[in-house]
Amino acid sequence: MDFNLQAYQADHLLHLSAKPERRLSILENARHRWLEMDGVVQSAMSLSQPERLFLPHQPSIAERLPAQASRILGLGPGGGDLTRHLGARWPEARHDCVDLDAEILTLFQQFFQDASQRSPRLHHADALHFLLQSQDAYDLVLLDLFSQDGNPLLLFQAPIYQALARCLHGTLIVNLLPRTHLELAQAKRLAEEWIGPTSAHGVPGYRNVILHATNLA
């Protein structure tokens, strides 16, 4: 059964935390478990099929995944929807997940990690700092960073794309929530300049735009 963003109902509150900058809750019913931030669903998991994707922008990401990936980096994994999906698709792949919010990583481990899959390596770090310090090479990077009203400024500046160019030899997929056409144009220009050929794909009915870039250098 699909997770309906307009009609879901919770039977249990599994976790609640509130800070000045955000409120986190994890809820569950007989079929699904989900993570809400300030009342907005950020991740959703089927209890019987943890690898399924439910949120509106995620099929667009799944359609643009490469045929194969063995070294995956997730910047801003949230509740790990794509981490679980990729773990089922490529069981032998090595997966690193980076998040600035330590609580998000802890909640992923406690409530959203699929025990049947190879465990990802979790890193509590700033995304740009992690990239600058990393000595690893990746063939797939998923970039899904957000702030209260969209994406952080970082996604519209050159340094993160320059850092990605150094460690990426394959596919970059970015989940954008552009506030203006100028933000979208800026992110696409930077991805094309530093990564390679880039295409933008809107999600009907939502702000999300998925950027797909390829670096084969």
Residue locations for each model-derived region?
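Rossmann-like AdoMet
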Residues: M1-A69, A88
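Class I S-adenosyl-L-methionine
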Residues: S17, L182-A217
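Histidine- and/or cysteine-centered catalytic micro-motif in compact active-site loops
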Residues: V40, F146, L177
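Conserved beta-strand signature within the Rossmann-like core of class I S-adenosyl-L-methionine
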Residues: H169-L176
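The AdoMet/dcAdoMet-binding core of the Class I SAM-like
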Residues: F3, R52-R166, T180-L182, P204-Y206, ...
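Well-ordered beta-strand positions enriched in small/hydrophobic/aromatic, beta-favoring residues
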Residues: L35, L172, I210-L211
